[in-house]
From Swiss-Prot:
Any one of the GO BP annotations: regulation of oxidative phosphorylation
InterPro entries: UQCC2 (IPR037698)
TM stretches of this protein: none
Cellular compartment(s): Mitochondrion matrix, Mitochondrion nucleoid; Mitochondrion
Transit peptide interval: 1-13
Protein name: Ubiquinol-cytochrome-c reductase complex assembly factor 2
Keywords, alphabetical: Mitochondrion, Mitochondrion nucleoid, Transit peptide
Pfam family, one: UQCC2_CBP6
């Protein structure tokens, strides 16, 4: 029975897309890591709580098959801010987040980072 669960989770991992623009923050990559941790021994792994494992698989599978998107259809593909899903993807990309963090830095911090001055050298 554990081998069946393992194969179902592997199939789910294959179907779940990985967003390369969200390095370290992608749900697909996180799910793959968790499956690798939970099934370290592959098909011979013993599952401690089979009911919880099956429930987790069912929940992830519903998300993967867009069950809730079809059950609760939206009239428009925008949020309350009138921003589309594509615009959200662009804003939440790791490259854009790095640029925004760089913009948040003050002028002195940017210059110090640019010239690689360490705080201890600054005081001496």
């Amino acid at each position: 029975m554990a081998s069946l669960r393992y194969r179902r989770f592997l199939k789910l991992c294959e179907e779940w897309p990985v967003d390369e623009t969200r390095v370290g923050r992608d749900l697909g990559a996180f799910i793959r890591q968790r499956v690798a941790q939970a099934f370290r021994e592959g098909e011979s792994t013993q599952v401690d709580d089979p009911d919880a494992c099956d429930e987790m698989y069912a929940s992830l599978n519903r998300m993967n098959t867009n069950y809730y998107r079809e059950k609760y259809p939206r009239l428009q593909d925008t949020s309350f801010t009138e921003v589309t899903a594509e615009e959200y993807k662009m804003v939440l990309a790791s490259d854009n987040l790095k640029q925004m963090e760089e913009m948040k830095k003050g002028m002195w911090k940017r210059l110090r980072d640019k010239f690689n001055v360490k705080p201890s050298e600054e005081n001496s």
